Amino acid sequence: MSEQEKVEQEEISAELETQNEQEKPMEETEIQDGDALENAIARVQELEEQLIQAVKKEQDILLRTRAEIDNIRRRAEQDVEKAHKFALEKFAKDLLETIDNLERALSTPANVENETIKSLVDGVELTLKGLLSTVARFGVEPVGVIGETFNPELHQAISMQPTEGFESNQITVVLQKGYLLNGRVIRPAMVMVAQ
């Protein structure tokens, strides 16, 4: 081999070595860039998953909050409705004494031949009738009728006695009428029941 060939070969070798050295850092950089890219993709996927979980959690909280608000609104409406229905309860209970007194006055035998007494009795009857119709408009209704079946939710039994013409558990005597206000008992009827 000639000197010139040797020099050329050395130049080629040197050039190859330089090229190899330049390629090595590029490969390392590519490898490092590849690792960084994979890490970045993994991190993005992890953050996306966290975001999805956070959105689901917030949607769940939103649904629960809406349901709670609906429940509160419904309870408030029911409370207002009950307040409207039963605001008159104390007043109605106080009126029951007046109704009882008027009924007792009418049940007392009176000499209706005297015109003054007859007109007084008629006035009491009209007053009672007007009072009963007025309280009925506000949801007050009487309970406790002779012959009705005894109901412990509506009636209070004072005594039980055998009575002809009545079946067992039928009301034979009403000592004091009971009353309901919009379906709720404000005073049970005091009754005697057949055995």
Curated annotation (Swiss-Prot):
Instruction: List, in alphabetical order, the Gene Ontology terms for molecular function in this entry.
Output: adenyl-nucleotide exchange factor activity; protein homodimerization activity; protein-folding chaperone binding; unfolded protein binding
**Main localization (coarse):** cytoplasm
Tell me the GO BP annotations in alphabetical order: protein folding
Biased composition, class Acidic residues, residue ranges: 10-20
Protein location: Cytoplasm
One of its Pfam families is GrpE
- Which domain of life, per UniProt? Bacteria
Going by the UniProt record, its keywords in alphabetical order are: Chaperone, Cytoplasm, Stress response
The residue stretches assigned to a coiled coil in this entry are none
A cellular-component GO term for this protein: cytosol
Family annotation (PROSITE patterns): GRPE
**Region spans: Disordered:** 1-30
As for what it does, the entry says:
Participates actively in the response to hyperosmotic and heat shock by preventing the aggregation of stress-denatured proteins, in association with DnaK and GrpE. It is the nucleotide exchange factor for DnaK and may function as a thermosensor. Unfolded proteins bind initially to DnaJ; upon interaction with the DnaJ-bound protein, DnaK hydrolyzes its bound ATP, resulting in the formation of a stable complex. GrpE releases ADP from DnaK; ATP binding to DnaK triggers the release of the substrate protein, thus completing the reaction cycle.
What is the protein's quaternary organization?
Homodimer.
Family, per entry:
Belongs to the GrpE family.
- HAMAP family assigned to the protein according to its UniProt record, in alphabetical order: GrpE (MF_01151)
**Protein name (record):** Protein GrpE
Q: What organism does the record attribute this protein to? A: Histophilus somni (strain 2336) (Haemophilus somnus)
